[in-house]
Amino acid sequence: MSLSGLISTTTFKEQPAIVRRSGNYKPPLWDAHFIQSLQVIYTEESYGKRINELKEDVRRILEKEAENPLVKLEQINDLSRLGISYHFEDQIKAILNLTYNNNNALWKKDNLYATALHFKLLRQYGFNPVSSEIFNAFKDEKKEFKESLSKDVKGMVCLYEASFYSFRGEPILDEARDFTTKHLKQYLMMTRQGQNVDHDDDNDLMVKLVEHALELPVHWRMKRLEARWFIDMYAEMSHHHHMNSTFLQLAKLDFNVVQSTYQEDLKHVVRWWKTTSLGERLPFARDRIVEIFLWSVGLKFEPQFRYCRKMLTKIGQLVTTMDDIFDVYGTLDELSLFQHALGRWDINTIDQLPDYMKIFFLATYNVVNEMAYDVLKQNGILIIKYLKKTWTDLCKCYMLEANWYHSGYTPSLEEYIKNGWISIAEPLILVNLYCLITNPIKEDDIDCLLQYPTFIRISGIIARLVDDLGTSSDELKRGDNPKSIQCYMKENGICDEKNGREHIRNLISETWKEMNEARVGESPFSQAFIETAIDFVRTAMMIYQKEQDGVGTNIDHYTKDGIISLFFTSIPI
């Protein structure tokens, strides 16, 4: 048969076009050339000597005895909010130990501010037990908080902040939160209406503090951004209340010098991201290397963790890209092939993958192996199998969500959360972080960590729910899986999304109580590492502030402001 005859008698099946979704993500805000052009001014070499002198001055201040323990507590609180308490952990613990073990509490008797500040600091620094029953002293014969307390705005703010360190089964702190929230809102309303007589600079500062607290409590805020805000507030206070000028000088210099290390590290990760070509080759995915670096600073802001931040940023951007592959771009068959290849962790298996997956797999493979090699050099332990497990666990959860989407299945809220606290990638990030900051690494400890203990599960749940509040509206518009809000609504026959969102907010608040318990509970892991799990949540609450998506569709709002203040704007000295 002639070739022309073969062509004329053969029916060719046209391959159906693959329909792929789009996340409609905005391009990156930050130009790589701008990042590389940043001028580093406040270097350790130039300002290290002055910082060390100021640190010695602060140590002397902390070690100087005070007649009233409240003075020392205020110093600790100021150092914490200024972002420099990490230099003085030993001195702070020594002071708090004295107040914790001292039964003579006349200095705080009938003083709401002193009582609340002491309680807050003890819980903040992990002392246990610290009974919330001390606040019964501020109730009346009806067992309700005395209305007269509302006149003590400073004490009310402190009680409000303290209430966010509550455990389960502490109704008095729930009552305290409701009571203070109500009266602080009334205080703001009356001040705006000119009904507060004392309208002066002090009152203006108090209004700012109250507004800031009601927007989000300090316990829920990203530490470094909170420090940046409070440094400006402290400078304003110093003109009226004779705040400690040494504290302020150190806070400003410390912030600027640490910011310089962030600038250098940001240049590094931006160069790395450019060399991967993933931003160009996978244009459907979020190109958010600067925003992810902000997240790494939220987890470990101290200057000694530079390598940790750089590696976490690389890992975080890869996780974000993989999330978009599964959520937006990949077909079910492609995703299944990718899951198999990742499970094998063998570059010889990637020939069967589509091109966009090949380059992504190799980029991930190289970063994970680079990290494992560095840890092997430093610690003498091979961690590939541990890192691989975190990636395969995450991929398994992504795959389940993809199957839900393609089958049109809506899980129950419990089923959704059971998968979602892992798919938020918090377990992967924390296991990697543990390997980056721990020396020596003990196999028993990392085996335990890979069982994802309670503090990892709880922080993952909160982060997932916070993420859902910020992203569900945009994701549903493009046809994504139902989020926790919609799962709850369908399960309970609720039509009004406001009710669904309110339930998730309440669930977040209740789960925070479990997180507070985990901070002081028995664990083979250090309190500092457990605190990092909480910092993951704090950073999530900043990224998705006011229930907006600061990594996906709303990058030019709160996240942008945070990046500018932390990385690009130094504090005038």
From Swiss-Prot:
Binding site for Mg(2+) 3: D467, T471, E475
Catalytic activity: (2E)-geranyl diphosphate = beta-myrcene + diphosphate; (2E)-geranyl diphosphate = (1R,5R)-alpha-pinene + diphosphate; (2E)-geranyl diphosphate = sabinene + diphosphate; (2E)-geranyl diphosphate = (4S)-limonene + diphosphate
A single MF term (Gene Ontology): magnesium ion binding
Expressing tissues: Expressed in glandular trichomes two to four weeks after flowering onset.
Cleaved signal peptide residues: none
Protein name: Myrcene synthase TPS5FN
UniProt: Mg(2+) 1 binding residues: D323, D327
Domain of life: Eukaryota
Obligatory cofactor(s): Mg(2+); Mn(2+)
GO BP, sorted A to Z: diterpenoid biosynthetic process
Function statement: Involved in monoterpene (C10) olefins biosynthesis, constituants of cannabinoids and terpenoids-rich resins. Catalyzes mainly the conversion of (2E)-geranyl diphosphate to beta-myrcene, and also produces minor products such as alpha-pinene, camphene, sabinene, limonene and terpinolene.
Stored Gene3D superfamilies: Farnesyl Diphosphate Synthase, Terpene synthase, N-terminal domain
Gene: TPS5FN
Binding site for Mg(2+) 2: D323, D327
Annotated cofactor note: Binds 3 Mg(2+) or Mn(2+) ions per subunit.
Residues engaged in binding (2E)-geranyl diphosphate: R286, D323, D327, R464, D467
Alphabetically ordered keywords of this record: Lyase, Magnesium, Metal-binding
Family recorded in the similarity comment: Belongs to the terpene synthase family. Tpsb subfamily.
Pfam families to which the protein is assigned, alphabetical: Terpene_synth, Terpene_synth_C
Source species: Cannabis sativa
Pathway(s) it belongs to: Secondary metabolite biosynthesis; terpenoid biosynthesis
Top enzyme category: lyase
Lineage: Eukaryota, Viridiplantae, Streptophyta, Embryophyta, Tracheophyta
